[in-house]
Amino acid sequence: MGKIIAVVNQKGGVGKTTSAVNLTAALSALGLKVLLCDFDPQANATSGLGVDKRKIKHSIYDVTINDIPAEEAIVSTKYGDVLPSSADLAGATVELINSQHRERQLEKALQPIKGKYDLIFVDCPPSLELLTLNALCASDGILIPVQCEYYALEGLSDLMNTLRMVKRKMNPRLEIFGVALTMFDGRTNFSTQVAQEVRKHFPGKVFTTVVPRNIRLAEAPSHGIPVTVYDRTSRGSVAYKQMADEIKAKLI
């Protein structure tokens, strides 16, 4: 049975989707069977793996709201499988609000396919509302991207409070799978200080690999290609491949 890992941080612009996309591609290249479930209405993870949002037959919205089997919505790509998102998902919170077990809809959708994958990443929206709560209830662990910049730790206390609440009341198996340091600038002492602070806050949970600031990471999504393929030797690509090695080792 594979693991479900929610990639979550309620702050935007921390490298959440970039991490989800590139770790999916890098782990797939290592021979793992990986699914990226795009649970963000912006659907950037969907397009980041080369899936044309205009041409998908079903999305995660149809799976969670209309009970379409997840298998019917999954799109296979050269970089891993994708359970695509769409703008319709933005209205899912309103549609689910009066539903029984509204926080369990994603869990119900993913359970039938969980055993077919080594790893399922869930790319969460940058907020702590019902969609993210669904992801936390469905997951075995969370991966938290934290940018090595000012205010990096701001808001993480809210995330940790939510994590503790979900673990206590809804999903006792939920753990911190790992913390990924992103947007690291080795030219500044500040990035190093933030990295040290994050490691102090999450002892034993922070990946050794840090993801540097890298122009190729910003360019790759516009081509619908993971940076691990777009520019295999770039610093961003090398970092995500090394982080994928760390994740694979944790799964064994």
Residue ranges, per PLM feature:
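P-loop NTP-binding core
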Residues: M1-I252
